Amino acid sequence: MPFKLFDVSKPIPERKEHTYVKHCGDP
């Protein structure tokens, strides 16, 4: 549980980059 909360509070850069690329690539 704490792990998920931490991930939401402070997402890792690797995950953020993946989301940014997906969002930018997805029209």
UniProtKB/Swiss-Prot annotation:
Cofactor binding mode and count: Binds 1 [8Fe-7S] cluster per heterodimer.
Catalysed reactions listed for this entry: N2 + 8 reduced [2Fe-2S]-[ferredoxin] + 16 ATP + 16 H2O = H2 + 8 oxidized [2Fe-2S]-[ferredoxin] + 2 NH4(+) + 16 ADP + 16 phosphate + 6 H(+)
Domain of life: Archaea
GO BP annotations listed: nitrogen fixation
Record EC number: 1.18.6.1
Intrachain S-S bonds: none
The entry's keywords: ATP-binding, Iron, Iron-sulfur, Metal-binding, Molybdenum, Nitrogen fixation, Nucleotide-binding, Oxidoreductase
Iron in keyword set: yes
Gene Ontology terms, MF aspect: ATP binding; iron-sulfur cluster binding; metal ion binding; nitrogenase activity
Cofactor needs: [8Fe-7S] cluster; [7Fe-Mo-9S-C-homocitryl] cluster
Subunit structure: Tetramer of two alpha and two beta chains. Forms complex with the iron protein (nitrogenase component 2).
Functional description taken from the UniProt entry: This molybdenum-iron protein is part of the nitrogenase complex that catalyzes the key enzymatic reactions in nitrogen fixation.
Assigned protein family: Belongs to the NifD/NifK/NifE/NifN family.
Name of the molecule in the record: Nitrogenase molybdenum-iron protein alpha chain
UniProt source species: Methanobacterium ivanovii
